Amino acid sequence: MNKNYSYPLDLSWSTEELASVLSFFNNVEAAYEQKVQAEKLLKSYEAFKQVVPSKGQEKRIGREFENVSGYSLYHAVQEAKSKGKGSISLGK
């Protein structure tokens, strides 16, 4: 996948909010490119949900992220929730 893509960010977010969203995106990327601890991904998802509480906005950001990266926020979170503990890897 193209490594030179832009994250779907809202410029009205504070620095801390941007950091939370970027951390979540990075953990999703890690789940596809290497592996990531399920707990770490879920913790970053909780922080992401503090910034993006609306399900509609979450879906929109998820679609935008998947369009540019090829990685699904939804699938990564679902895999982490089903695994609970340990590492997850969604790479081919």
Swiss-Prot record:
Which InterPro entries is this protein grouped with? Answer: BH2638-like_sf, UPF0223
Pfam families given in the database record: UPF0223
Q: Which cysteines are joined by disulfide bonds?
A: none
Similarity remark: Belongs to the UPF0223 family.
- For this entry, the protein name equals UPF0223 protein SSA_0938
